[in-house]
Amino acid sequence: MHYFGTDGIRNKADWLLKNEIPYALGKVLAKRGGKIIVARDVREHSLDMEKQLCQGLMEGATQIWVTGVLPTPALAYIAQIEKADYAVMITASHNAPEFNGLKVFGKCGKKLSESDETALDNELFLTMNSPSAPQPVFIDEACADALTDEELNSELSVSLAENHRIRIVDGAEFLYLKHVKSMFPRFDGMKIRLDCAYGCFATLAPKAFLELGAIVCAEHNVRDGKKVNVDCGSTHVADFAARVQKDEIGFAFDGDGDRVLAVVDGKVYDGDAMLLALSTLYRLQGKLKKRFVVGTILTNTKLGRELAYHNTALIRTDVGDKHVLDALEKQGCLLGGEKSGHIVMLDKGTTGDGLVTALSLLEVKRTVGSLPKFIPYPMLEFGILIR
């Protein structure tokens, strides 16, 4: 049995908890040791998933850092600057509230390679077939105690939980927001409408746009584990598009913040359109030296044609951001993504980041004057059974 899919482990939360999948994954990662950072999204059962994961991690990991609720790209950034060996995000991304999952990052916040993920999947299978009962772990209360020099010098606030094995991390969101704002100019007077999907970016995204000078109207901008992604966010962008005014640009996030879809001139601006717009900015900034942009087998043919006009080639991969990231690293280029709005810009982060993508699109508009129109070719998607 394989537990990992296109983006980590994902299933109904009740099934994951009943079968102790988080605990088993924790045991597997614990054998590898090092510093492991854990974050979760807003779903009601994410805290139970976190506790079970930490039960497994305590069987061997030397340092366990717990951040609480945090967007996926923020966890990747914290793992990068803190040089973590692994990071685990508890989330089901854009899926409904009854689902949950586990995304695993490797060294310094990078997505696992396909070979590393396969090895982890195999170890998880073996662990699941030799179960042992998890022991209770308490991670809700923090207390002061001796910390390492590295932790004392960190910009994060780190304290020890009462079991003295788990470190409670505070300030991760602030540090991430500070980092994101440092990468962009001001957008004074630009009108923005946000659909925050009741998810991890519910308060963080409006704050980022406001502090960069934009005029913001935000919807679904409270964190709510029962409502996350329900009739809102990037999976229901058509409804949102109808509410975006002519003088606004709209951005619809998903539950954990690793993807975004835009609304431009009243029409949905998907990942293919965003890649075209961002390639324009990268070309002007001299960042398309390799003349490659990475898409997937689902990327619309129109994008390849548009890129070709500017002497840029489209490379296609299998569906999944891990395949996009692998191609980016192999080709030595910076920009890639999926039609779903999962965009990767390796000069700005190690994984897809909905907030950074949205701000980058505003930078395109600020620099060029408008976002390029993108009218996709008609495409038919269907599966073929091969016997």
Per-range role (PLM):
Residues 1-63, 85-86, 129, 137, ...:
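An N-terminal, well-structured beta->alpha segment
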Residues 20, 24, 100-245:
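Gly/Ser/Thr-enriched, mixed-charge loops and adjacent short helices
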Residues 30, 36-100, 178, 207-263:
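N-terminal small/polar loop signature for handling phosphorylated ligands or for N-terminal nucleophile
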Residues 35-41, 65, 191-194, 291-297, ...:
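Short glycine-rich phosphate-binding loop at a beta-alpha junction
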Residues 39-41, 194-196, 264, 347, ...:
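Short glycine-centered, acidic/aromatic-flanked micro-motifs in structured strand/loop junctions
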Residues 87-99, 244-268, 314-353:
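Glycine-rich phosphate-binding loop
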Residues 288-387:
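Phosphate-binding and adjacent anionic-ligand microenvironments
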